[in-house]
Swiss-Prot record:
UniProt-recorded name of the protein: Glycine--tRNA ligase beta subunit
Family membership: Belongs to the class-II aminoacyl-tRNA synthetase family.
EC numbers on record: 6.1.1.14
Keywords: Aminoacyl-tRNA synthetase, ATP-binding, Cytoplasm, Ligase, Nucleotide-binding, Protein biosynthesis
A single BP term in Gene Ontology: arginyl-tRNA aminoacylation
Length: 688
């Protein structure tokens, strides 16, 4: 079998940087899927992505599609011929569709009789004849939310397409993709290298593009180069570069030929909280800040240019000039904000609507203050500090800094509170109230901050559910899913003794008559338990384990987590499968019971297996009670796992539905007690 390397490059206008990597990997995945569907073998697929191009290279692609045989089964022989042995219309129609006569058909014997069959051979096509459609289909399936048209084209893509190059080895694959004919011409860097040049062989990519076009097409190569050079620049300046993965990938998507440079800003700006300076450097300018070994911001930053002049002075000075006004604004806002205390901004919260039916931000602040105090009492935090932090929780939204740099909310509240002389725990809580901000983010460190964070999240959840605006589909304008998961993480990971129903009831009471949904408590609790499912599935915990616990609907998150861990452990035991099956059988038997089931009567036991199980469950009922009270569900299930032998013996030797009513009721009582022991932890009958 002969093979060749295949290259396809789509040359475009500047692609959206935050979507570039996803587009490139999806393009490669789609090409791979199309090749597999076509039956074409290959060794490896490589993807390339730069601001003005997407490319895929297939290594050792078979140049010929294999032939294949397909079996077309026709009617049964009994239905294919009439009483005189002549073909029926059904048989003739089938044969005609296969391009044969009925006489040419073969026969195949099965356990359901004899059937007409035709084995047809489909010759494989040369790969080059298939590639245009393969690429077109792969591009059509890209995740493009808002495709665009350009010039007089009728086709749509994420950005205008200027060049298409498809090469199988050295052979140009002719065809048209997105309204552009395939050609050997590819474009180089917009400012460096050759503007256009021809590529003769797929093997020349991406090296030729770098040599002639001054473009590093390999996304990961550019990324690694930017990271290494940025770290080296920071080290030379006596610091460490703050390089977040998301920003690194965005910067990588903005440049074709990275030139990493360092610049500086005036030291006077360091009097402004570092978070505000970093916000504008990262968010607006896509710069990497530099910190010293103690975590203090240095008056330097790193940026990545898309051009590489011999003397970079002009570029460096240009970037310093661009960032200076933004830092000056931050300095002005900070100094202006310090003239008014946070607490004095409370009245202005009355002018800002939180939600039309739920009132203003001042209303929300009042509710957070009260609920944070209640939570603080339950978790052993300082109630007064929690209430004070709740009262001030949204005041920084009224500052100039947060109005201009929205992502600094919370952290600026902390800085302003410190300036105002507020207690340190209160100040820190103003920042940590929003934690966790995203998946994997850190949690509030103090119990005071945890109380405020939980109060804020439960207020939002209860309020929005209370007016019937639960999330639908992917729409979640109030970020309720994030709020629910964040609250669960705080309670579980800090092992807080809190109950969801209790918290929602207390939160709902603070809304007076604003809530219209009478089922708000159950709705919020069910929603949050549903988030548990997503959380544990992300951790790799089996769905049936989660369902086993959900069946009991425990509403204390820390308790819920302990049950999940216990059932997950139980599932690994040798006796788990048999006991799960036995519990399922017990559930079915008890569901058919036609009378109330009483307590076990040991003296009424007749069979040895019956008495053995009765004694075992009664002993275990006593032994597991203190463990249940301690929440040590793993130990409970470890003990109950010892019931496998007496349970198996019971079902092998005892007839539950005995004719004697007293005997039958006692055996049902044994099974009811057995089931009850497991249900104190979870419904293990749902385990698969």
């Amino acid at each position: 079998m002969t093979t060749q390397n295949f290259l396809v490059e789509i040359g475009t206008e500047e692609l959206p940087p935050k979507a570039l990597k996803t587009l490139a990997t999806s393009f490669a995945d789609n090409v791979e899927a199309e090749l597999i569907q076509a039956g074409l073998s290959f060794d490896k697929i490589e993807w390339f992505a730069a601001p003005r191009r997407l490319a895929v290279k297939v290594l050792n692609l078979a140049t010929q599609q294999p032939s294949k045989e397909i079996e077309k089964r026709g009617p049964a022989v009994s239905a294919a011929f009439d009483a005189e042995g002549k073909p029926t219309k059904a048989a003739e129609g089938w044969a005609r569709g296969c391009g044969i006569t009925v006489e040419q058909a073969e026969r195949i014997a099965t356990d359901k009789g004899e059937w007409l069959v035709h084995c047809a051979k489909i010759e494989g096509q040369p790969t080059k004849n298939l590639l245009n459609d393969i690429v077109a289909n792969a591009l059509a399936k890209l995740p493009i939310p808002k495709p665009m048209r350009w010039a007089d084209k009728t086709v749509q893509f994420i950005r205008p397409v200027h060049t298409v190059t498809m090469l199988l080895g050295d052979e140009l694959i002719e065809g048209e993709i997105l309204g552009v004919a395939s050609a050997r011409t590819i474009r180089g860097h917009r400012f460096l290298g050759e503007k256009e040049f021809e590529i003769q062989h797929a093997d020349q990519y991406p090296q030729l593009l770098r040599e002639k076009g001054s473009v590093v097409a390999d996304f990961n190569e550019r990324k690694a180069e930017i990271l290494a050079k940025s770290q080296a620049k920071a080290t030379a300046l006596g610091g460490v570069a703050d390089i977040e993965e998301s920003l690194l990938e965005e910067v990588t998507s903005l440049v074709e030929y990275p030139n990493v440079l360092a610049a500086k800003f005036e030291e006077r700006f360091l009097a402004v909280p570092a978070e505000a300076l970093v916000y504008t450097m990262k968010g607006d300018q896509k710069y990497f800040p530099i910190y010293d070994k103690d975590g203090k911001l240095l008056p330097h930053f790193i940026f990545v240019s898309n051009i590489n002049p011999e003397d970079p002075t002009a570029i460096i000075e240009g970037n310093e000039k661009v960032v200076r006004p933004r830092l000056t604004d931050a300095e002005f806002f900070f100094k202006t904000d310090l003239k008014q205390k946070l607490v004095d901004r409370l009245p202005r919260l009355e002018t800002v609507l939180f939600q039309q039916q739920l009132g203003t931000l001042k209303d929300k602040t009042d509710r957070i203050e009260q609920l944070a105090g209640e939570i603080a009492k339950q978790i052993g935090a300082d109630e007064a500090k929690a209430k004070r932090a709740g009262l001030l929780s949204k005041c920084d939204l009224m500052t100039n800094m947060v109005f201009e740099f929205t992502d600094t909310q919370g952290v600026m509240g902390m800085h302003y509170a410190r300036h105002d002389g507020e207690d340190e725990e209160v100040a820190v809580a103003l920042n940590e109230q929003y934690m966790p901000r995203f998946a994997g983010d850190e949690l509030p460190k103090s119990l005071v901050a945890s109380a405020v964070a939980l109060a804020d999240k439960f207020d939002t959840l209860t309020g929005i559910f209370g007016i019937g605006q639960a999330p639908k589909g992917s729409a979640d304008p109030f970020a309720l899913r994030r709020a629910a998961l964040g609250a669960l993480r705080i309670i579980v990971e800090k092992n807080l003794p809190l109950d969801l129903e209790d918290l929602v009831k207390k939160s709902a009471a603070l809304f007076s008559d604003k809530l219209t949904n009478k089922n708000v408590v159950a709705d919020v609790v069910d929603f949050m338990l549903g988030r548990f499912r997503a959380w544990y599935q992300d951790e790799g915990i089996a769905v049936d384990v989660i369902q086993a616990v959900l069946a009991r609907r425990p509403t204390r998150p820390a308790d819920f987590d302990a049950r999940v861990r216990a059932v997950s452990h139980f599932r690994t035991l040798d006796s788990a499968e048999a006991l799960a099956a036995a519990n399922k059988r017990v559930s079915n038997i008890l569901a058919k019971a036609d009378a109330a089931i009483g307590e076990i009567n040991l003296t009424a036991c007749v069979e040895p297996a019956e008495k053995a199980l009765a004694e075992a469950v009664l002993v275990l009922r006593t032994e597991v009670q203190p463990l249940i009270a301690q929440g040590d569900y793993t130990a409970v299930l470890d003990k109950l796992a010892n019931l496998r032998a007496p349970v198996d013996s019971f079902f092998d030797n005892v007839m539950v539905n005995a004719e004697d009513p007293a005997l039958r009721q006692n055996r049902l009582a044994i099974l009811n007690t057995l089931q009850g022991l497991f249900l104190q932890v979870a419904d293990i009958s749902v385990l698969q």
